[in-house]
Design a protein with these regions (language model features):
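N-terminal glycine-/lysine-enriched basic segments
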Residues: 1-128, 134-158
Length: 158
C-alpha cells in the first residue's frame, strides 16, 4: 500500500510494491504449511505417548516423530526469516515513500518484527531444537534484524 501510494514521487515504488505482494503470497502459504506441520507434530507426539513396546515399531515411531518435529521447527524459522525480509522492505519503503505514508510503513515494519519474534519463540520451544542448533541462531538473527529495521524507521518519525 505504501509503495503503491508513492508511485508518483518514487521511481522504485512499483518494484517495491511487487516485492511486497510476493512476500504477502509467501506469508499466506507459510501460514497454511505451519498449521499443517503443527497438527502433524501434535499427532505424532500423541502417537508416541500411546505406543507400546520398542523394537522396530518404536524406532520407526521415534524417527517419524523426529521428522515431524523438525518440520514443525523449520516452518516457523521460515516465518521468522520472512518477517525480517518484510521489515527490511517496509523500512526501505518508509525511507523513500511519500511522507504521509511513513507511519504506515513503520507500522508494517513493527508488525513484521512482532511476527518474527513470535515465530522465533516457536522455534525456541520446539522439542526438536536445542541450544546451539543452527536454526535457533538463524531465527534469533532474523528476529534481531526485523526488530532493528522497525526500530530504525519508528525512531526516524517520532
Amino acid at each position: 500500500m505504501v509503495a503503491r501510494a508513492s508511485r508518483d514521487s518514487w521511481d522504485e515504488a512499483t518494484g517495491v510494491a511487487a516485492q511486497a505482494l510476493a512476500l504477502q503470497d509467501r506469508a499466506a502459504s507459510l501460514a497454511q504449511v505451519d498449521a499443517e506441520a503443527w497438527e502433524e507434530a501434535l499427532s505424532a507426539l500423541r502417537n508416541a505417548g500411546d505406543g507400546e513396546g520398542g523394537g522396530s515399531d518404536g524406532a520407526r515411531r521415534d524417527h517419524e516423530l523426529e521428522r515431524k518435529l523438525e518440520r514443525a521447527a523449520a516452518v516457523p524459522l521460515q516465518i521468522a526469516e520472512l518477517g525480517a525480509d518484510i521489515a527490511a522492505l517496509a523500512a526501505q519503503a518508509g525511507e523513500l515513500c511519500d511522507g504521509a505514508q511513513r507511519a504506515d510503513a513503520a507500522a508494517a515494519a513493527a508488525l513484521a518484527a512482532g511476527g518474527a519474534r513470535a515465530a522465533t519463540h516457536l522455534v525456541v520451544v520446539n522439542l526438536g531444537v536445542r541450544e546451539g542448533d543452527e536454526r535457533l541462531a538463524r531465527a534469533r538473527a532474523s528476529e534481531q534484524a526485523a526488530s532493528e529495521a522497525a526500530e530504525r524507521l519508528l525512531a526516524s518519525i517520532r
